[in-house]
Amino acid sequence: MAERGLRKVRVGKVTSDKMDKTVVVSIETSEKHPLYKKFVKRTYKLKAHDENNECKIGDIVKVMETRPLSKEKRWRVVEIIERAR
């Protein structure tokens, strides 16, 4: 059997849990501005599969890349690192 390539793993915060078995995760990165050389925070959102509807808004979660599960879902929740208070 051929080995599978490394899958991307990201850590982010759940910003929406209104969908069934799906959460929206916001991931914040900082990158250097090409002209001004200042570090700028950028936030991007992705939809992740949450099989048991365990995640709530504010949870810190680890997501892993997976096969396409729907039109926009290509990530799944691996673990909940920290629960929201």
Curated annotation (Swiss-Prot):
KW Ribonucleoprotein (keyword) present: yes
Record's GO cellular component terms: cytosolic small ribosomal subunit
CDD domains, per the entry: Ribosomal_uS17 (cd00364)
GO molecular function: rRNA binding; structural constituent of ribosome
UniProt xrefs under Pfam families: Ribosomal_S17
GO biological process: translation
UniProt keyword terms in alphabetical order: Ribonucleoprotein, Ribosomal protein, RNA-binding, rRNA-binding
PROSITE patterns listed in its UniProt record: RIBOSOMAL_S17
HAMAP family associated with the record: Ribosomal_uS17_B
PANTHER family on file: 40S RIBOSOMAL PROTEIN S11 FAMILY MEMBER, SMALL RIBOSOMAL SUBUNIT PROTEIN US17M
Described purpose of this protein according to its UniProt entry: One of the primary rRNA binding proteins, it binds specifically to the 5'-end of 16S ribosomal RNA.
Subunit structure: Part of the 30S ribosomal subunit.
Family of the protein in this entry: Belongs to the universal ribosomal protein uS17 family.
Protein name: Small ribosomal subunit protein uS17
Protein's organism: Acetivibrio thermocellus (strain ATCC 27405 / DSM 1237 / JCM 9322 / NBRC 103400 / NCIMB 10682 / NRRL B-4536 / VPI 7372) (Clostridium thermocellum)
Gene responsible for this protein: rpsQ
